[in-house]
């Protein structure tokens, strides 16, 4: 006699069976039972409790860890060739804004009214997109907020 179930319970049964089979395909941990040498209730034990530590099957010994070789930087640079800390540290928010403001104006020809403002916004947007690849989301939001405040000040004059 064939197993005849409605579609939903049959699907549920198949899913449960497949999960069971998939889980049984993984190596099972060799857990040892916890052993305690507890005295009977009401009796004192001078040795104290001794518990055996049980490690799960997923531990560092199961992972193959490969160390990468250190890159060869050659001899240490001396004098002026040595990097100054400021050369490689990331820029602060104010320094990024200053650098972006320097690059915004450029050598654009002056145009009349809204056309000039539109070009500035388009160029600023392109600069923002290029620079934002290097920024985190929070830094990007701060930069955008400060830019919008500056834009409101410029437009209000």
From Swiss-Prot:
Chief location: secreted
Locations listed in the record: Secreted
Designated name of the protein: Tuberoinfundibular peptide of 39 residues
UniProt keyword annotation of Glycoprotein present: no
InterPro entries in alphabetical order: TIP39
Transmembrane spans: none
Native species: Danio rerio
Residues excised as propeptide: 26-116
GO molecular function: receptor ligand activity
Biological role: Plays a role as a potent and selective agonist of pth2r resulting in adenyl cyclase activation and intracellular calcium level elevation.
Similarity section: Belongs to the parathyroid hormone family.
Induction notes from the record: Up-regulated in the developing brain by shh signaling.
Keywords in alphabetical order: Cleavage on pair of basic residues, Neuropeptide, Secreted, Signal
GO cellular component: extracellular region
Pfam families in UniProt: TIP39
Keyword ATP-binding in record: no
Signal peptide (UniProt feature, chain positions): 1-25
BP-aspect Gene Ontology terms: adenylate cyclase-activating G protein-coupled receptor signaling pathway; neuropeptide signaling pathway; startle response; swimming behavior
């Amino acid at each position: 006699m064939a197993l005849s179930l409605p579609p939903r319970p049959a699907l549920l049964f198949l899913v449960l069976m497949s999960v069971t089979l998939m889980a049984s395909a993984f190596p099972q941990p060799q857990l040892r039972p916890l052993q305690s040498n507890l005295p009977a209730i009401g009796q004192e034990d001078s040795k104290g409790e001794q518990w055996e530590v049980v490690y799960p099957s997923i531990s560092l010994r199961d992972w193959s860890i490969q160390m990468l070789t250190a890159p060869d930087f050659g001899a240490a640079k001396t004098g002026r060739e040595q990097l100054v800390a400021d050369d490689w540290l990331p820029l602060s928010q104010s320094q990024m804004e200053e650098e972006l403001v320097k690059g915004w104006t450029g050598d654009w020809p002056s145009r009349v009214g809204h056309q000039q403002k539109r070009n500035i916004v388009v160029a600023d947007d392109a600069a923002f997109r290029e620079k934002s690849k290097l920024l985190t989301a929070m830094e990007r939001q701060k930069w955008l907020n400060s830019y919008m405040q500056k834009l409101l000040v410029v437009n209000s004059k």
